[in-house]
Amino acid sequence: MKTKIFPLNKIAFACSLLLANPLAWAGDQFDASLWGDGSVLGVDFARFNVKNAVLPGRYEAQIYVKFEEKGVSDIIFADNPATGRTELCFTPKLQEMLDLMDEAIVKSPNSEDDTCVFASDAIPKGTFEYQSGEMKLKLELPQALTIRRPRGYIAPSRWQTGTNAAFANYDINYYRSGNPEVKSESLYVGLRSGVNFGNWALRHSGSFSRFENQSSSGFTDKGKNHYERGDTYLQRDFALLRGNVTVGDFFSTARIGENFGMRGLRIASDDRMLAPSQRGFAPVVRGVANTNAKVSIKQNGYTIYQITVPAGPFVINDLYASGYSGDLTVEIQESDGKVRSFIVPFSNLAPLMRVGHLRYQLAGGRYRIDSRTFDERVLQGVLQYGLTNHLTLNSSLLYTRHYRAGLFGFGLNTPIGAFSADATWSHAEFPLKHVSKNGYSLHGSYSINFNESGTNITLAAYRYSSRDFYTLSDTIGLNRTFRQFSGAYLPEIYRPKNQFQVSLSQSLGNWGNLYLSGQTYNYWEKRGTNTQYQVAYSNSFHILNYSVNLSQSIDKETGKRDNSIYLSLSLPLGDNHSADSSYSRSGNDINQRLGVNGSFGERHQWSYGINASRNNQGYRSYDGNLSHNNSIGSYRASYSRDSLKNRSISLGASGAVVAHKHGITLSQPVGESFAIIHAKDAAGAKVESGANVSLDYFGNAVMPYTSPYEINYIGINPSDAEANVEFEATERQIIPRANSISLVDFRTGKNTMVLFNLTLPNGEPVPMASTAQDSEGAFVGDVVQGGVLFANKLTQPKGELIVKWGERESEQCRFQYQVDLDNAQIQSHDIQCKTAK
């Protein structure tokens, strides 16, 4: 192989050819005679005489069925000998994404066979349109042949398990304070770690702490190093269960009934595995259209859904759960222009579920509290079911050797608001006292929005518990104490008797916002009633924001009454800086504070705060803080001092360490599921959707949060990478499972410009307009005049390239190459391309 450096001006013509649009529109004819006769003999230019012509090869495209996006996938085009055109191959992956009825597919592809099944043969009633400029593939098909799925539905077969990896989240805080008399320091390290292998995820949480106090007299109190375990469990999801299985130490997660720590086994549903339009509560809308009609659904004056339905009964069951309450207005516009409407009551503030939907949890094991596991074996079952548009049933059972409890309740959706009620019965046994207690607890709540007036009563709840009602934690705690003191000691516990709370918010338009809340409660073992009230008002005057908060608490047992007032002002200073001031009074204590805070930096990665305060006793204090966020974590520091000679300093850091197949990467704290991003040689490139996340020296970064069972788009901004690094694509799509660690590989090249001067064994140049692919079928470049292959998409420094100007073996050749991808200069190689014998 002969190698030389090629001057830039000699490839200008070749570049212009490659940058030109190779597609021809219907009616345009490609005149092959313009290209002479020698180097282009044997090339079929007819492929360019059709609309949206495309060269054979593998492409990445956004897939649509009608107007519904199905996701991103690789698609393959190949020459169809029957039509003489380049056509789309119907692959198993494409079949899975389209989610069509069996009757729509005449010929299915074989996953074990690489033979191209052309889409025109597989789906004769469908029309495919590939828009190369926008990288979109659209399928038009009769509606009767498409499967009606809820909006946002993703087939479980497309959920991605992720990669094997390990991580450790850390949160470190060091605090030191002192005055001339006493000095103290403490260290806290919070930990949440995990290992993923296959479909299973191992998780652990815990914390380490230590402290030390020292007096001026020389006395030192050194606390013991202490590690407190949280939970440690193994978990995986199962599509068949529409939920997950957890084994180990965990906390129950029931939405109704009692929650507690347990060592054992849990099977629970996960609503995130439903399509987004099936999560939360939204009513099913049923109606009848007399003709082909347009159905519009409005809430609070806004259209939230619109669809065209044929004549006859229709059902709409894929409304997205709304964060707002408000009845739904359904309008049916017939083809003759007549409009009918009706109302469907809707409130999302009660524990409601969609019709036919089930939420469950079944857990069994040993009771845990404060990192300790007890012999008390516990069995818990929770079930919620959407019976109708208006009624949801709730139930829960709890069983141990010395405790039983059962709950039954309902949520009710009505035109005058949302109601919920439940009753819990309990049976508690205290063996050492030779006594058992049977009790009950009643609970009810009501909520409503008045959208016209802007009034929102978010919660009006009441609970009454009988004298002999005990919770599981009450029962186990008392029995532990009885055993410890041989039944001779009766600990003092406070068990609720009556509880009532209400909150109301009112929008006053230009006059601001008003918030009112109140609660009252008492205990069986304690005289008197505790009552708390709060009134808050907020508004703005030009750019000045202000708020007022009044509160009162009353303890009738002691006769103590606390009144407090809090005033705050905030003034923007421009460019993410602001000044704020506050005044508070509680009893005879008065405090005033003045501060400045803000953020700065290209991506506002730095933030600060400076404050000064004083009270009516002459006490003064000053403090400042500074924090920084970047790809590998967040760091913070603060300092304070006061007029009593107290001083303190605090240092903190939080982040994560992730170990994976490409190495070890430092990261911001990661969530339940996250993504590892790898792009070789692209250090410095920014992750589009990640706050202050960039690729490190090794081309790795971590996207700290992803949404499970949903399409997540991971984008890269290559502007800060080296200029000669080229991305095959700057956006990838993932659909992670819960607790998964996704590995997102971006294929890159050094954008090395390589010219291969190709000749055939007979000495003739390779035909112009031939295409070159690597051993994996990826497009590498086109052959221009004189048999010159302009290859700027090489990803490997050596390998084999295949050049095609037709589908027959006699119309293709291949050659071995070796280049320097780190060389920014244009390289040229004289190579003989070998044909099949």
From Swiss-Prot:
Transmembrane region(s)? none
Ribosomal protein among the record's keywords? no
UniProtKB keywords? Cell outer membrane, Disulfide bond, Fimbrium biogenesis, Membrane, Signal, Transmembrane, Transmembrane beta strand, Transport
Topology within the bilayer: Multi-pass membrane protein
Q: Chief location of this protein?
A: membrane
Q: Name one Pfam family in it.
A: Usher
Where is the protein found, in the record's own terms?
Answer: Cell outer membrane
Gene Ontology biological-process annotations: pilus assembly
Q: Supply one GO molecular-function term.
A: fimbrial usher porin activity
Q: List the disulfide bonds.
A: 813-833
Q: From which residue to which does the signal peptide run?
A: 1-26
List, alphabetically, the GO terms of the cellular component aspect. cell outer membrane
Entry similarity comment: Belongs to the fimbrial export usher family.
Q: What does this protein do?
A: Essential for piliation.
Q: What is this protein called?
A: Outer membrane usher protein HifC
User: Could you tell me which species this protein originates from?
Assistant: Haemophilus influenzae
